[in-house]
From Swiss-Prot:
The keyword Chaperone does not apply. GO terms for molecular function: calcium ion binding; transforming growth factor beta binding. This is Latent-transforming growth factor beta-binding protein 3. Residues 274-328, 400-452, 914-968, 1086-1136 form the TB domain. It comes from Mus musculus.
Length: 1253
């Protein structure tokens, strides 16, 4: 019955993006039934069943990219692949369309039922085999002989498929040639068999997407894609290439049919892809040059390959097929292989291997597929290579040196006297060739076969070459150097010729000398010329009818057979027709075939078709590097290298070393002989050298021939040595002759700087000033005035040629004659040592301060306030009281002064006191010392993590543990006081961490004790970091509102805002404003003018800093700013406040004032209009302006000047600022400096004892 009308049901794509397929344009063609052809076709072109069933089924196609690469290391290459993301296309009933478009995909539904092996490529086009044409490949092509040489549909350029006569109706935008590989997937419905169930099956394919990355050394495998098609069990699946990268036509096809309905319900799996090798190396299964692309093992080993593999290489198995193509079907038992050029399709069918579909076949030429074989046609200027898979460009033979030996140092030795071509050199006795010492390829490799296709001892004669490729239709190609190629008609043969093998005849290389008569490999019939010359070599083939592959019905396992049925062939006796069919062997006829019994030295072809010579040289019987093995018919010969001799033993011929050192006196009397494999070496004794003779010997060296041997005397030669007869000093011989006086003054300037006077046998020097003669009087040397020590005393003396320079040290100055340094008496200056005794020293002075005083600035003695300098003095059980030049401790009750009166100690110390450590996390945890004289309870019940002395630390017990409650029964922050007992139980007291640990826990802040614990208060602009135990600067620049439209720079306790001119920073608005905006800003400061004339000109600028408009006009100003803005009349402006409504947030929040208000000490109100405020600012107040000082400053007694506050003196009485450190006052602030012998640790910044190195 006819199929459904129109196109088959389409595919609904549901795609996911994948990296490797995102840019790939794939063409998916789905045939949902043989009856899906276009209407109006002939009746024979329509299917008869199964289409409707498949159209109702839902199927799915999954594309899984696999990206492969090749890694080579030390000559070993390995391929590895990685799985990419999947893409899925789903088709089901009810979504019929001609074209579906997705991201990176073009989906076309094809309604054509291509017949006779045709493959659907688009909506209206079939790719037909060479023997058929027509829209559906239903019409046999006229003259289907493969050798017609025509350009019709039967002969495609790159494969065996051709399109019908109808033009393709591809949708707009589709390209015939693409840089990507385009494949078609066909799902074809078959009639369901009896008893088959509905479960779906799936088929998998692994196809290449395009060429791999090619470099100068490594050719990476191309990326591949794994295609999985889920389909009903009655359907079959085919995948074939529509277009390859930069191709001009169809490239290849792959077919996969589902398994017959068997005992195994598991779906078929995709066979892996690997590398196909055509040659093998000695002791290795594979060669070094595989085909560029990936192939299946059955395609490789069933056609041109000898080995196949993926990460490892394996030799191809021997084919088990022993049948001969004769009339009628040829049956073999189950498990038998298909013949050469075919692969098994199922248990009863063999399918032709399309060698042209293998990547890299017939490079630089055209590949033509034949049933069971293929053909390579090379363009002019190219010839078929020995591997028969590529065309090689003809190049003129260059002649150069031929070397017979290559040393272990990669140096070429023993060149031949005549120049040879690389082929003549490497195919005979040469080991390297050319001026660059190019090594000859190893025997048996692909490179060796490339230049020596006939093996060692043979070379190609360019006068006559015969290239023969035998397939289903035999043909020969003759190349003539003197004329165009002439086609040769071959006789028809009743059977297929044996496959090619790597022998001289099968390579098509004739080893006989040139002859005048043209003859082919099969010399049975004369040749005829039937066509004029053409630019390409013409192919002449024997016509052969098409081969039909008939599928036999299913038979029992014992009767299953493989059938390949060629038609119109008569049965013949090959042994009788061709007596030399086996070559070097005897042909034995059989009932259905013949076999060959080969002679000694020959082996049977793998297909048992004829005898080929055994190449004994592959095993290197002559020895590596010892000789050249020449393979002969049935045997071999050894041509030993120099230094080796021929040895004939039970194991055959070989080359053994020749010991030349057995010959006496081989190296002469001046040396000895050392034998090496293949050569010998003469080692000469000292005083002898090797003479370049044949053979080389050691001869005496006449050292006296060299004039430099005895430059100062006469030379006398001796065997192996020489003797010099010295001349008198000042005399010299001329080449061993008489001794003559040497004029030293004429040979140079030995007395420079000075004058030379020649004397008999010597000379004399008169030196210039600053130089003196040397001890021998033969040269002038510089006088080192600095070495004598008489100049530059108390300075650095630098010697110069003929003189010297003085550089005085600190405390010295240069004398008038600039020859010495004189001391500077610093005590002559009154300010050198104020309050102390000045003692002048050489180059410096000393200021000795009385006891209890210290030197300030190196010039002033000041009383040391030990109590403020070290707040920890007398703590924790006493108070420090400063004295002039000393201090004393006032101890608490229960404590007494120490002997030095500088500390308080308990009358009785029931507890030991040691150091308290903060944590063990520091790299050097010994530096994290909180206190140095505390009990274990005071340490571990408060902030301590360990307690001990000198880094012998006892960890504090874990909080809430039994040990902790035993040590700290009252909890964190409390300790027991044994002096206070309530009801027999010691009372607890709070631990004052601020006194116990001081600045170690509240750095840069004020510590306030609480019960329990403590609080650390920081200055404005700082915050307390509980991990660092210190006040850390606040980065105001992190707040974008602080410096809008400007560049914010964080400072310690504040920040700066840099504006781009002419913009200015507005503190009130915390942003950069333009001049127009600043004009109306209340905080803008400019010059204040004391007078303003009637003409609007301002004059008399007021002294002091710039003021705002309000500050200027509320005082004595009459004009303001560079534009001389007039001030309003007194009492009329609203900008001058009448009551105190302002507050200074700085003074309200500054902890440094300790309760002092600016109204009391830091401001000055003036009743008059004038306000004098040096280093501060005037603020208008009722009754007059007030002088206010910035942070860190206070008003002096005059109330008109801001002076710096000495925080170290006023605020560090109890060590609130710098505990255990030295406080240094700065302008507006202060800083803490560690005492001598201490250094600041990280990360807490505490001062710890400096380690001695």
């Amino acid at each position: 019955m006819p199929g459904p009308r129109g196109a088959a049901h389409g595919l609904a794509p549901a795609m996911r993006q994948a990296g490797a397929l995102g840019l790939l344009a794939l063409l998916l063609l789905a045939l949902l039934g043989p009856g899906g052809g276009a209407e109006g076709g002939p009746a024979g072109e329509r299917g008869t069943g199964g289409g409707g069933a498949l159209a109702r089924e839902r199927f799915k196609v999954v594309f899984a990219p696999v990206i492969c690469k090749r890694t080579c290391l030390k000559g070993q290459c390995r391929d590895s692949c990685q799985q990419g993301s999947n893409m899925t296309l789903i088709g089901e009933n009810g979504h019929s369309t001609d074209t579906l478009t997705g991201s990176g995909f073009r989906v076309v539904v094809c309604p054509l039922p291509c017949m006779n092996g045709g493959q659907c490529s688009s909506r209206n086009q079939c790719l037909c085999p060479p023997d058929f044409t027509g829209r559906f490949c239903q019409v046999p092509a006229a003259g289907t002989g493969a050798g017609t040489g025509s350009s019709g549909p039967g002969l495609a350029r790159t494969g065996a498929m051709s399109t019908g006569p109808l033009p393709p109706l591809a949708p707009e935008g589709e390209s015939v040639a693409s840089k990507h590989a385009i494949y078609a997937v066909q799902v074809i419905a078959d009639p369901p068999g009896p008893g088959e169930g509905p479960p779906a099956q799936h088929a998998a394919f692994l196809v290449p997407l395009g060429p791999g990355q090619i470099s100068a050394e490594v050719q990476a495998p191309p990326p591949v894609v794994n295609v999985r098609v889920h389909h009903p069990p009655e359907a079959s699946v085919q995948v074939h290439r529509i277009e390859g990268p930069n191709a001009e036509g169809p490239a290849s096809s792959q077919h996969l049919l589902p398994h017959p309905k068997p005992q195994h319900p598991r779906p078929p799996t995709q066979k892996p892809l690997g590398r196909c090798f055509q040659d093998t190396l000695p002791k290795q299964p594979c060669g070094s040059n595989p085909l560029p692309g990936l192939t299946k093992q059955e395609d490789c080993c069933g056609s041109i390959g000898t080995a196949w593999g993926q990460s490892k290489c394996h030799k191809c198995p021997q084919l088990q097929y022993t049948g001969v193509q004769k009339p009628g079907p040829v049956r073999g038992e189950v498990g038998a292989d298909c013949p050469q050029g075919y692969k098994r399709l199922n248990s009863t069918h063999c399918q032709d291997i399309n060698e042209c579909a293998m990547p890299g076949m017939c490079r630089h030429g055209d590949c033509l597929n034949n049933p069971g074989s293929y053909r390579c046609v090379c363009p002019p200027g190219h010839s078929l290579g020995p591997s028969r898979t590529q065309c090689i460009a003809d190049k003129p033979e260059e002649k150069s040196l031929c070397f017979r030996l290559v040393s272990t140092e990669h140096q070429c030795q023993h060149p031949l006297t005549t120049r040879l071509t690389r082929q003549l050199c490497c195919c005979s006795v040469g080991k390297a060739w050319g001026a660059r010492c190019q090594r000859c390829p190893a025997d048996g490799t692909a490179a060796f076969k490339e230049i020596c296709p006939a093996g060692k001892g043979y070379h190609i004669l360019t006068s006559h070459q015969t290239l023969t490729i035998q397939g289903e239709s035999d043909f020969s190609l003759f190349l003539h150097p003197d004329g165009p190629p002439k086609p040769q008609q071959l006789p028809e043969s009743p059977s297929r010729a044996p496959p090619l093998e790597d022998t001289e005849e099968e390579r098509g290389v004739t080893m006989d000398p040139p002859v005048s008569e043209e003859r082919s490999v099969q010399q049975s019939h004369p040749t005829t010329t039937t066509s004029p010359p053409r630019p390409y070599p013409e192919l002449i083939s024997r016509p052969s009818p098409p081969t039909f592959h008939r599928f036999l019905p299913d038979l029992p396992p014992s009767r299953s057979a493989v059938e390949i049925a060629p038609t119109q062939v008569t049965e013949t006796d090959e042994c009788r027709l061709n007596q030399n069919i086996c070559g070097h062997g005897q042909c034995v006829p059989g009932p259905s075939d013949y076999s060959c019994h080969c002679n000694a030295g020959y082996r049977s072809h793998p297909q048992h078709r004829y005898c080929v010579d055994v190449n004994e040289c592959e095993a290197e019987p002559c020895g590596p590097g010892k000789g050249i093995c020449m393979n002969t018919g049935g045997s071999y010969n050894c041509h030993c290298n120099r230094g080796y001799r021929l040895h004939v033993g039970a194991g055959g011929r070989s080359c053994v070393d020749l010991n030349e050192c057995t010959k006496p006196h081989l190296c002469g009397d001046g040396g000895f002989c050392i034998n090496f494999p293949g050569h010998y070496k003469c080692n000469c004794y000292p005083g002898y050298r090797l003479k370049a003779s044949r053979p080389p010997i050691c001869e005496d060296i006449d050292e006296c021939r060299d004039p430099s041997t005895c430059p100062d005397g006469k030379c006398e030669n001796k065997p192996g040595s020489f003797k010099c007869i010295a001349c008198q000093p000042g005399y010299r011989s001329q080449g061993g002759g008489a001794c003559r006086d040497v004029n030293e003054c004429s040979e140079g300037t030995p007395c420079s700087p000075g004058w030379c006077e020649n004397l008999p046998g010597s000379y004399r020097c008169t030196c210039a000033q600053g130089y003196e003669p040397a001890q021998d009087g033969l040269s002038c040397i510089d006088v080192d005035e600095c070495e004598a020590g008489k100049v530059c005393q108390d300075g650095i003396c630098t010697n110069t040629p003929g003189s010297f320079q003085c550089q005085c040290l600190s405390g010295y100055h240069l004398s008038r004659d600039r020859s010495r340094c004189e001391d500077i008496d610093e005590c002559d200056f009154p300010a050198a040592c104020i309050g102390g005794d000045c003692i002048n020293t050489n180059g410096s002075y000393r200021c000795l301060c009385p006891q209890g005083h210290r030197l300030v600035g190196g010039r002033k003695c000041q009383d040391i306030d030990e109590c403020s300098q070290d707040p920890g003095l007398c703590l924790p059980h006493g108070a420090c009281e400063n004295l002039q030049g000393s201090y004393v401790c006032v101890c608490d009750e229960g404590f007494t002064l120490t002997q030095d009166q500088h500390g308080c100690e308990e009358v009785e110390q029931p507890h030991h006191k040691k150091e308290c450590y903060l944590n063990f996390d520091d790299t050097v945890f010994c530096d994290s010392v909180l206190a140095t004289n505390v009990t274990q309870q005071e340490c571990c019940c408060s902030l301590g993590a360990g307690w001990g002395d000198h880094c012998e630390i006892y960890p504090c017990p874990v909080y809430s543990s039994a040990e902790f409650h035993s040590l700290c029964p009252d909890g964190k922050g409390y300790t027991q006081d044994n002096n206070i007992v309530n009801y027999g139980i010691p009372a607890h007291r709070d631990i004052d961490e601020c006194i116990l640990f001081g600045a170690e826990i509240c750095k840069e802040g004020k510590c306030v004790n609480t019960q329990p614990g403590y609080e650390c208060y920081c200055k404005q602009g700082f915050y307390y970091d509980g991990n660092l135990l210190e006040c850390v600067d606040v980065d105001e620049c992190l707040d974008e509102s602080n410096c809008r439209n400007g560049v914010c720079e964080n400072t310690r306790g504040g920040y700066r805002c840099a504006c781009t001119p002419p913009a200015e920073y507005s503190p009130a608005q915390r942003q950069c404003l333009s001049p127009e905006e600043m004009e109306h800003a209340p905080e803008r400061r400019e010059v204040c003018w004391g007078q303003r004339g009637e003409d609007g000109m301002c004059m008399g600028p007021l002294a002091g800093p710039a003021l705002t408009f309000d500050d200027c006009c509320c005082r004595q100003g009459r004009g303001w700013g560079t534009q001389c803005r007039p001030c309003p009349p007194r009492g009329t402006g609203s900008q001058c406040p009448t009551s105190q409504s302002e507050s200074n947030s700085f003074w309200d929040t500054s902890p440094l004032l300790l309760g002092k208000s600016p109204r009391d000490e830091d401001s000055s109100e003036e009743d008059s209009d004038e306000c004098r405020c040096v280093s501060g600012r005037c603020v208008p107040r009722p009754g007059g302006a007030v002088c206010e000082c910035p942070g860190g400053f206070q008003l002096d007694a005059s109330r008109a000047r801001c002076v710096d506050i000495d925080e170290c003196r006023e605020l560090n009485q109890r060590g609130l600022l710098c505990k255990s450190e030295r406080c240094v006052n700065t302008s507006g602030s202060f800083r803490c400096v560690c005492k001598a012998g201490f250094t600041r640790s990280r990360p807490h910044g505490a001062c710890v004892p400096q380690r001695r190195r």
